[in-house]
Amino acid sequence: MAKINLTPKKIYEQEFKTSIRGYDKTEVDEFLDDVIKDYTVYIALVKELQEENAKLKAKATSAPASRPAYASATSEPSHATTNIASASNYDILKRISRLEKEVFGKQIVE
């Protein structure tokens, strides 16, 4: 991870060399004020994300203890679900059989 070299204080205290045709000091100061504001926001955001990351890591380490109970409950379908599925399949097969008799039975007669 990259190290942050600047702090809002370092940016504020930065001195620039002046020359005959140097930069406008007020313009540089205004820009640095904006940089300091943004930098302060970034620091707060990083702290917030680090706290959230720590909470999620703590939650992830405690989650495996509760996960096996959930996994075993969902890994085996219940007998009621299996019975309903087979009853539905049986009904579908009966309907298909009746439809085939209707369609193909009439064709044989004609």
From Swiss-Prot:
One GO biological process this protein is involved in is:
regulation of cell shape
Tell me the segments the record calls region Disordered: 59-79
Coiled-coil annotation reads 37-63
Positions with biased composition (Low complexity): 60-75
Out of the domains of life, which is the source? Bacteria
The record's subcellular location field reads: Cytoplasm
Pfam families noted in UniProt: DivIVA
Q: Does the keyword NADP apply?
A: no
As for what it does, the entry says: Divisome component that associates with the complex late in its assembly, after the Z-ring is formed, and is dependent on DivIC and PBP2B for its recruitment to the divisome. Together with EzrA, is a key component of the system that regulates PBP1 localization during cell cycle progression. Its main role could be the removal of PBP1 from the cell pole after pole maturation is completed. Also contributes to the recruitment of PBP1 to the division complex. Not essential for septum formation.
Question: Subunit details for this protein?
Answer: Forms polymers through the coiled coil domains. Interacts with PBP1, MreC and EzrA.
What does the sequence similarity comment in the record state about its family?
Belongs to the GpsB family.
Protein name as catalogued: Cell cycle protein GpsB
Which species expresses this protein natively? Streptococcus thermophilus (strain ATCC BAA-250 / LMG 18311)
